[in-house]
Amino acid sequence: MFRGATMLSLDNKGRLVIPVRYRDILKEKSQSRMICTIDLHQTCLLLYPFLEWESIEKKLSDLSSMNPLERRVQRLLLGHASECEMDKSGRLLISATLRQHAQLSKEVMLIGQLNKFEIWSGPNWQQQIKDDITSKQPVQESLSERLKGLSL
């Protein structure tokens, strides 16, 4: 559904403009409603169409609040989840708390990840790509069974 990397600018109010190519599907699938939250592993944000988020929220509600790790995941994802609505101009307001977490300033990158977007600061995105390409991790040993079967 969502793919590609697009450089965008945040305006003075912390809004970004969703690219035109995604607006119709977001209007159709989730009535322009989205949920933005933090990524658990990297300094970026995750932006979900509302219907996608509802299925994730269901999975999160099935986790046990008695298990410390599961409770931490719930706290981080749900505690930072912010509902955003795309306006008629395609703008989406990112809360100050989320912008601060992802170190967003003027230049941001919107990265399509099939069912969601990642939102990165420009410099953090460039560093992440560099790190991913130059990673010295033994590739074959770290591949999951799903990745071993993926042919590109």
UniProtKB/Swiss-Prot annotation:
One of its GO terms (molecular function) is transcription cis-regulatory region binding. SUPFAM superfamilies: AbrB/MazE/MraZ-like (SSF89447). PROSITE patterns: SPOVT_ABRB. InterPro entries: MraZ, MraZ_C, MraZ_dom, MraZ_N, MraZ_sf, SpoVT-AbrB_dom, SpoVT-AbrB_sf. The keyword Transcription applies. One of its GO terms (biological process) is negative regulation of DNA-templated transcription initiation. It is found in: Cytoplasm, Nucleoid. Residues 5-52, 81-124 form the SpoVT-AbrB domain. It holds the Pfam family MraZ. The keyword DNA-binding applies. Belongs to the MraZ family. Forms oligomers. HAMAP family: MraZ (MF_01008). Negatively regulates its own expression and that of the subsequent genes in the proximal part of the division and cell wall (dcw) gene cluster. Acts by binding directly to DNA. May also regulate the expression of genes outside the dcw cluster. This is Transcriptional regulator MraZ. The lineage of its organism: Bacteria, Pseudomonadati, Pseudomonadota, Gammaproteobacteria, Enterobacterales. The gene is mraZ.
